[in-house]
Structure formats: C-alpha cells, structure tokens
Design a protein with these regions (language model features):
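Thiamine diphosphate
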Residues: 1-119
C-alpha cells in the first residue's frame, strides 16, 4: 500500500536513509543541527522548516550547523565534494541561492581545468 508523505517528511526520510547507507554523506546548513554541541544548545528543530529534525541525534557530527554565510558553506560543500565526501546543503530559502553562484559557476565549474583534471 502506498504511503502519503509531506515534502518535509519525504526529504527527511531520504536524507536519513542515505546518511545511514553511506558514511560519506554530510549535511550542512543554518540550524540543521539545532546548535547541538554549542553552549546553550536547544532541542534540534531541524532547520527553519524542520526538514532535518532528528538527523543530528542519529548521525551526529555529520550534521553541521553553519554560520549565516551561504556562499561560505556552499564553497565548503564544493571543497568537501572535491575531496570525496557527498555533501548536502540546506539553504533556508531559494532567495539565498543567488549569493552562492560565484562558488558554483566560477569555482566548482572550473575545478577540472584549474587542477589539471585531478579534481
């Protein structure tokens, strides 16, 4: 019998399944771990929409809160991918994607050529 899931539940379940299956999958974003490990940590809400709720408890340090600098953590994810990890980045809202374009178009897109095909 088919299950009915909200988008939030489907994304959470897919992330959980893939992080369980593959240790190289990491998750980065603002408040995705609810400040876990920080002084005054709170119950992990799971990002602004609750999509990552419960993932820190299950996968620990592979779920990472980031500073409010989308370009920085997208750049970090690109570097992580170049080193063999499989990063998933949660941007709070699609409006913030534009500030990441430099990392995507001017950095990641040229890695192969900048590093002689070794990245």
């Amino acid at each position: 019998m088919a299950r009915t899931l909200s988008f939030q539940q489907a994304i959470n379940e897919a992330l959980d399944q893939e992080m369980t299956r593959d240790e190289s999958v990491i998750l980065m974003g603002e408040d995705v771990a609810g400040g876990q490990g920080a002084e005054g940590e709170m119950d992990a809400w799971g990002g602004v929409l609750g999509v990552t709720k419960g993932l820190y408890a299950k996968h620990g340090d592979r779920v990472m809160d980031t500073p409010i600098s989308e370009s920085a953590f997208v750049g970090a994810a690109i570097g992580a991918a170049a080193s063999g990890l499989r990063p998933v980045v949660e941007l709070m809202f699609n409006d913030f994607l534009g500030v990441c374009f430099d990392q995507i178009f001017n950095q990641a897109a040229k890695f192969r050529y900048m590093f002689g095909g070794k990245a």
